Amino acid sequence: MLRSSIRLLYIRRTSPLLRSLSSSSSSSSSKRFDSAKPLFNSHRIISLPISTTGAKLSRSEHSMAASSEPKSLYDFTVKDAKGNDVDLSIYKGKVLLIVNVASQCGLTNSNYTELAQLYEKYKGHGFEILAFPCNQFGNQEPGTNEEIVQFACTRFKAEYPIFDKVDVNGDKAAPVYKFLKSSKGGLFGDGIKWNFAKFLVDKDGNVVDRFAPTTSPLSIEKDVKKLLGVTA
């Protein structure tokens, strides 16, 4: 038995045919392995640029979003009572009092009367009132823009601009009012509570103060004078 095993081993080592077959098999396996190498290399080459490009786009988009954010009241355009665009940058250098008005409110008479008095006294010093009709509080401003302007100008001699009717709260709130509220929040949150809420804006378009609907216009005269630089 031992002799048979030794003889077989000797034949395998010395037989030219067996050595040739073994060498051919080994060479074929090596070639198959070598031919697979470029596949792995090509995968490594094309996988690198993808995430880098994505990162650059993300930074660019973030930069564009940041640059488009409004920085002052002058970045907004609104509609006047006739539907024409008004770029609020025309009020640069003026002190502004922005009010959401209504024609059928319990605060209508006192506010419209005092607004007219305040405007008459300081319009020559660079003071302007911007009135925005709003029907969100008790449906107390139901009329058309034309009716609202006629009411304010005829009954209260309003000479300041009255703009297009807007929403001041909710998803449909005018962008300018979203800016005003975010700049100066109220006592119980940012939302406008009623008709005749007031925002005071300085000569640079910054919102510097906010007053409740029940605050009378003449009671904030000292604040207006301070921003105007009027001492008398």
UniProtKB/Swiss-Prot annotation:
Look up and give the organism this protein is from. Answer: Arabidopsis thaliana
Q: Pfam families, per this entry?
A: GSHPx
Induction comment from the UniProt entry of this chain:
By salt stress, osmotic stress, cold treatment, and metals. Up-regulated by salicylic acid (SA), jasmonic acid (JA), abscisic acid (ABA) and auxin.
Annotated family: Belongs to the glutathione peroxidase family.
User: Which residue interval is the transit peptide?
Assistant: 1-54
GO molecular function term, any single one: glutathione peroxidase activity
Among InterPro entries, the record links this protein to: Glutathione_peroxidase, GPX_AS, GPX_CS, Thioredoxin-like_sf, Thioredoxin_domain
This one is known as Probable phospholipid hydroperoxide glutathione peroxidase 6, mitochondrial
Q: Which residues form the active site?
A: C105
Q: Which reaction does it catalyse?
A: a hydroperoxy polyunsaturated fatty acid + 2 glutathione = a hydroxy polyunsaturated fatty acid + glutathione disulfide + H2O
Q: Which GO terms describe its cellular component?
A: chloroplast; cytosol; mitochondrion; plasma membrane
Record keywords, A-Z: Mitochondrion, Oxidoreductase, Peroxidase, Stress response, Transit peptide
Extract the signal peptide range: none
